[in-house]
């Protein structure tokens, strides 16, 4: 598979209606850039741009993105989170201290950062997958920081874990908003049939959704069928066809 890059698209039309956006021909970030770092040499994944009006790192726009790479000392392959800075969202400069957040275990994913500021603390909601300390495959949790660079991992219970028939395989990829006093935690839910959808957890009971996955497709299961109803057979004289291989088989 070809590696993924980070691109840029824009629109001058209202966001409330579905329409095609204009896209830049070339990526704004690529693993082939001269300043690409070791932790992103394999491929780049999801990005999110945080508008830091205080310019904590010297620029108003901070892009958090996760990428795959091998550690130059341990050779561990993992997905880690790094940042890049911009003044116009068109040209980006990688932070020299990348990655800013990672879990060093082979095959582990630390990704899809979603940044919110609560008081004077920056909160990074993120998902982790294939973490050897967990029995489940993917889950949502968070880390906190005062400067967008140094992050302290939450050591308490994970926020969202696989626990329902719609997210029993993966419960990951956070997007968190607070509206009218209620915190809504949207996330991607994947069940054992690999059906994928958007689920939500709330800070207080808000009822149940009426949306459901389609009935699961049954695979690799032996089925017994009765063939004695509605079937007919004919006895054909194969000699009439000159050669038995030419005779039709009718059931």
Please annotate each region the language model reported.
Residues 1-45, 50-108, 116-169, 178-213:
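Beta-rich carbohydrate-recognition and catalytic domains
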Residues 11, 65, 87, 111, ...:
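Intrinsic-disorder/low-complexity regions
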Residues 113-114, 174-175:
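Conserved beta-propeller blade repeats
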Residues 213-251:
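Extended carbohydrate-recognition surfaces in non-catalytic/accessory domains of CAZymes
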């Amino acid at each position: 598979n070809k590696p993924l890059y980070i691109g840029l698209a824009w629109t001058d039309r209202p966001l409330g209606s579905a329409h095609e956006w204009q896209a830049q021909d070339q990526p704004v970030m690529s693993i082939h850039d001269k300043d690409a770092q070791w932790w992103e040499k394999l491929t780049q994944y999801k990005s999110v741009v945080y508008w830091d009006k205080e310019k904590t790192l010297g620029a108003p726009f901070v892009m958090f993105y996760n990428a795959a790479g091998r550690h130059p000392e341990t050779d561990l392959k993992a997905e880690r989170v790094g940042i890049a800075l911009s003044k116009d969202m068109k040209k980006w400069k990688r932070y020299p201290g990348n990655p800013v957040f990672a879990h060093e275990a082979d095959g582990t994913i630390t990704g899809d950062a979603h940044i919110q500021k609560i008081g004077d603390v920056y909160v990074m909601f993120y998902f982790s997958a294939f973490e050897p300390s967990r029995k489940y495959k993917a889950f949502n949790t968070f880390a906190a920081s005062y400067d967008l660079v140094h992050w302290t991992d939450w050591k308490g219970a994970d926020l969202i874990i696989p626990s329902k028939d719609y997210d029993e395989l993966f419960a990951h990829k956070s997007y968190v908003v607070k509206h009218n006093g209620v915190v809504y935690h949207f996330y991607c839910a994947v069940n054992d049939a690999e059906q994928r959808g958007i689920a939500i957890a709330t800070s207080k009971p808000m009822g149940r959704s009426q949306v459901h996955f389609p009935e699961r497709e049954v695979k690799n299961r032996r089925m017994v069928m009765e063939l004695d109803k509605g079937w007919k057979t004919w006895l054909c004289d194969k000699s009439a066809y000159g050669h038995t291989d030419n005779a039709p088989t009718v059931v």
